[in-house]
Amino acid sequence: MAQHTPATSRAGTFGAILRVTSGNFLEQFDFFLFGFYATYIARTFFPAESEFASLMLTFAVFGSGFLMRPVGAIVLGAYIDRIGRRKGLMVTLAIMGCGTLLIALVPGYQTIGLAAPALVLLGRLLQGFSAGVELGGVSVYLSEIATPGNKGFYTSWQSASQQVAIVVAALIGYSLNITLGHDAISEWGWRIPFFIGCMIIPLIFVLRRSLQETEAFLQRKHRPDTREIFATIAKNWRIITAGTLLVAMTTTTFYFITVYTPTYGRTVLNLSARDSLIVTMLVGVSNFIWLPIGGAISDRIGRRAVLMGITLLALITTWPVMQWLTAAPDFTRMTLVLLWFSFFFGMYNGAMVAALTEVMPVYVRTVGFSLAFSLATAIFGGLTPAISTALVKLTGDKSSPGWWLMCAALCGLAATAMLFVRLSRGYIAAENKA
């Protein structure tokens, strides 16, 4: 049977990568749409006395989905580590699809009152619950089918697939801006991309049904029960904590340059919606290019060199470039600054994903990776739009989101030093055998 055949043949490698990353595409497609259409969603579901209050409520609901990620990481991650990568990834896709359908179909506040924002919140919670293990499950799968010496390159396609989703979503949004008027988009047009997302769910189910189990999982003789999984996670809390800080840099930068960029460009820098979409498309293409490069370079010179080099560069340059952007904001400056941040994200994340799979205990690799990633996304990435909006409002400084990006870079630098010191001293290897 297909599900018991190890996914190791060269001929099937590309197909395996495509099938396993298809769910990543859907997840990021929906998340980007929520960020880009935040102002329209705010008016539809969260009417308030001021645009700022309405937008903050929307971003709070957006962030709530990330708070469910750690729960999904633990529950679904333990399930995947116990029963297999293939079956677990099918379950996450089903839950994600339910959340997507709910957001696309729920009527507005004017039609059903408080039930509208409540249902949107439920949809985001379902998406967050499934997404809590989606990245981890995909990353672990890719790391386990990778050929020797190419783990960084293979795992980089987890994030690269998300960039395709960003470009596709931005292209759809750009097309709608050209063909529909502002009023039409505000009233009903913003739902069209969400319906498109619903339409591709059956295709992704077909792709994932033919996914083969990894040889590494099939060869495991021991299948830990839930108690063993939780005990191992508790024993390795230091690795989980360091992993969370390691992910902070990538998740904060990513959600700033993709999800928050359209809102930042329109409401803070006063650029047009079309300009913001074009910049976002360019960022998606740039991310797609730099991610596999970062992963491949880390395979050659080591994860630590890439991670520390990029975090130091981010700490040195983030504030000056944000000041330069906001001094005279225009399309060219915004493009250059975000492409610079895209370089940070792609290179760092390309190395980081492989590093995180390598330091996690083998029997809880999915739940450990997913928990660290989910905590970082909930604390840092998911709250980036709300924190950035609040910083600009409270300080009156349009470049103030740069401080948040620098904070995340500092976390990444500290985590890299912490993990690789422990790795060099043999602590992590010993813990992984426990």
From Swiss-Prot:
Q: Which Pfam families match?
A: MFS_1 (PF07690)
Q: What SUPFAM superfamilies has UniProt attached to this entry?
A: MFS general substrate transporter (SSF103473)
- Sequence intervals crossing the membrane: 22-42, 55-75, 88-108, 112-132, 165-185, 187-207, 239-259, 277-297, 305-325, 336-356, 367-387, 401-421
Q: Choose one Gene Ontology CC annotation of this protein and give it.
A: plasma membrane
Q: What is a GO molecular function of this protein?
A: symporter activity
Q: Which GO terms describe its biological process?
A: citrate metabolic process
Which InterPro entries is this protein grouped with?
H+-coupled_symporters, MFS, MFS_dom, MFS_trans_sf, MHS_symport, Sugar_transporter_CS
Keyword set, alphabetical order = Cell inner membrane, Cell membrane, Citrate utilization, Membrane, Symport, Transmembrane, Transmembrane helix, Transport
Indicate how the chain sits in the lipid bilayer: Multi-pass membrane protein
Q: What subcellular locations does the record give?
A: Cell inner membrane
Q: Give ranges for the Cytoplasmic compartment.
A: 1-21, 76-87, 133-164, 208-238, 298-304, 357-366, 422-434
Where is it mainly found? membrane
- Please report any disulfide bonds recorded for this protein chain, giving both cysteine positions: none
Instruction: Pull the Periplasmic topological domain ranges from the record.
Output: 43-54, 109-111, 186, 260-276, 326-335, 388-400
Query: What is the purpose of this protein?
Result: Uptake of citrate across the boundary membrane with the concomitant transport of protons into the cell (symport system).
The similarity comment for this entry is:
Belongs to the major facilitator superfamily. Metabolite:H+ Symporter (MHS) family (TC 2.A.1.6) family.
Quote additional remarks: Allows the utilization of citrate as a sole source of carbon and energy.
What protein does this entry describe? Citrate-proton symporter
Q: Which organism is it from?
A: Salmonella typhi
Which gene does this sequence derive from? citA
